[in-house]
């Protein structure tokens, strides 16, 4: 899915926000973009809303979807030029060291989603390329400790979890930040959730991302 299409990494005050969009990386160029009103509305229905986060203190909201090309590595360059993107939406929220980013993509056909998943998420080079790209984007005060693909509940036709642990040093203190990339897809809809927070909150973050993935993909109209 546009699982790794765009990865932007920001390190601030010991928190790492890794923003992704959709569920497919770059490969042989870009997918074709042919937005239509119905699929744009369907994409907006799937992303995180403030009410989905429950507690107060969250700031953020809708932002421009990232449609740029994703990482390219020698052993990882999935074909995307035959995919047609008909809808996209994105929201980002932050709260005291936590960052939640969601981006949805609607493709023209179900078959395109299946191709997208097989080429990018299931590709043997995905983990290695993602880790390399993340590490390259971090500043000198941060480094990737680990990055791997983990099991995730089959909440939809397609579901996967990539988890990174990043060490961040600031003012003589080093903290470890968890960065989870959750990818789910159903019918023509793809959703990427990026959840960032302290490693000490791993259990709470895992529960939150499963709850969100389940409720958001249930809102898919396309």
Residue ranges and their predicted role:
Residues 27-89, 132-133, 138-139:
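N-terminal "mature-domain start" segment
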Residues 84-122:
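A short acidic-to-branched-hydrophobic micro-motif
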Residues 100-104, 180-181, 186-197:
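Short, well-ordered beta-strand elements
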Residues 1-27:
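Secretory targeting and sorting signals
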Residues 34-39, 99-108, 196-203:
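Second-shell loop/turn segments in exported
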Residues 107-112, 149-159, 185-189:
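A short, structured loop/turn motif at beta-sheet edges
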Residues 193-222:
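Surface-exposed amphipathic alpha-helical segments
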Residues 60-68, 124-180, 218, 222:
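Short Gly/Thr-rich strand-loop-strand
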């Amino acid at each position: 899915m546009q699982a790794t299409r765009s990865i932007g990494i920001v390190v601030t005050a010991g928190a790492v926000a890794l923003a992704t969009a959709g569920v497919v990386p770059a490969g042989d160029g870009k997918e074709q973009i042919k937005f239509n009103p119905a699929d744009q509305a369907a994409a907006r229905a799937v992303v995180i809303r403030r009410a989905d986060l429950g507690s107060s203190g969250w700031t953020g909201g809708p932002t421009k979807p990232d449609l740029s090309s994703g990482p390219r590595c020698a052993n990882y360059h999935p074909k995307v030029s035959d995919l047609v993107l008909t809808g996209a939406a994105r929201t980002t929220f932050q709260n005291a060291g936590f960052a939640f980013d969601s981006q949805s993509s609607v493709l023209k056909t179900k078959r395109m989603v299946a191709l997208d998943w097989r080429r990018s998420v299931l590709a043997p080079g995905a983990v290695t390329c993602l880790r390399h790209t993340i590490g390259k984007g971090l500043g000198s005060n941060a480094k990737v400790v680990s990055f791997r693909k983990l099991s995730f509940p089959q909440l939809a036709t397609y579901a996967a979890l990539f988890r990174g642990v990043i060490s961040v040093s600031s003012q003589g203190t080093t903290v470890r930040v968890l960065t989870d990339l959750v990818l789910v897809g159903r019918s023509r809809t793809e959703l990427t959730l990026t959840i960032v927070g302290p490693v000490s909150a791993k259990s709470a973050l895992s529960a939150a991302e499963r709850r969100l993935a389940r409720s958001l993909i249930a809102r898919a109209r396309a």
